[in-house]
Each structure stands twice: as structure tokens, then as C-alpha cells.
A protein has these predicted regions:
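Conserved "landmark" site that anchors the functional core of diverse proteins
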Residues: 1-148
Length: 148
């Protein structure tokens, strides 16, 4: 199974989608991406369903190693994005080869960076969403599950 290995964590990252819209009456918040238009842009660029899971990265990105070839998009807040130490543009499709290293720096404008992968992140769906909400979704720490 293709995976992304987290080599260095940024400030805070989580998996998000369009959220849980019908569970507030039982105390479950909407959740979902904080900048839905940026998440949608990444999914659209990759021809993913708009509700495909994305990684939401707050303020400071990390370093990620790809095990297989794929396509990604990085949208949202402006930041330094490098693949194999080569600066790349945001808001476009980026081709990734097995063994490529993605490094995201701190944001220079905005708060939320979105890492979007072709097909979306494969995570559990709970109450109709893949969005992280710590009271109902699995709690992982970097050393518990360094591969995604």
C-alpha cells in the first residue's frame, strides 16, 4: 500500500474533509477543513471527490517521504514548498516519484496549508466524515503511526 512517512512534524497537522454536518444535536461539532475553498481547490486539481480527505497543516509544515509515485497538490496559505530541495509552486498538480522528499516551511501568509494526494488520504470514516475530532477519532502520536 502506498504510504507517506512523516520524517519531521510541523506545528500541527490533521486529516480533514467537509466535516460532519448533522451531529451537532448530540454534541459532535461540524469539524472539517478550516479553509474549505483551499481544500476543495486541491481536490479539484487532482480530480478527487470534493469530500476526499486532505491533510490540514497549521502554520508550519513538515517533511514527508513518499513510498510510491503519485500526484499531489499543495494549496492554502503561502509557504516554501520543496520537492527534493527544489522550490515548487502551490496550487498546481505536482508529480511525485517513489523516494521523493516533500518539505514545507512556515507560512508567510495565512494559517492553513493543505496537502492533497490523488485519491485522498485513506482513513476511517466515523459518523460520515474522515475529519479528525479527538473525542471520537483514533488518537495517534507521531511515534504511534509515522506512516499515512
Amino acid at each position: 500500500m502506498p504510504s507517506i512517512t512523516l520524517l519531521h512534524a510541523g506545528f500541527y497537522s490533521s486529516i480533514q474533509d467537509r466535516g460532519r454536518k448533522s451531529h451537532r444535536h448530540i454534541g459532535i461539532p461540524h469539524s472539517g477543513a478550516m479553509d474549505q475553498s483551499s481544500a476543495d481547490l486541491g481536490n479539484s486539481l487532482l480530480n478527487n471527490a470534493l469530500d476526499a480527505a486532505v491533510m490540514e497543516i497549521i502554520l508550519q509544515g513538515g517533511t514527508y517521504l513518499f513510498s510510491h509515485s503519485t500526484r499531489i497538490a499543495v494549496t492554502g496559505a503561502k509557504a516554501s514548498i520543496r520537492i527534493n530541495n527544489i522550490l515548487v509552486d502551490q496550487n498546481k498538480v505536482l508529480e511525485i516519484s517513489a523516494g521523493d522528499l516533500l518539505k514545507m516551511g512556515a507560512t508567510s501568509s495565512g494559517n492553513f496549508i493543505y496537502l492533497v494526494i490523488a485519491g485522498g488520504f485513506l482513513t476511517d470514516t466515523i459518523l460520515g466524515s474522515k475529519a479528525v475530532y479527538h473525542n471520537i477519532t483514533k488518537k495517534n502520536k507521531t511515534n504511534d503511526a509515522p506512516e499515512m
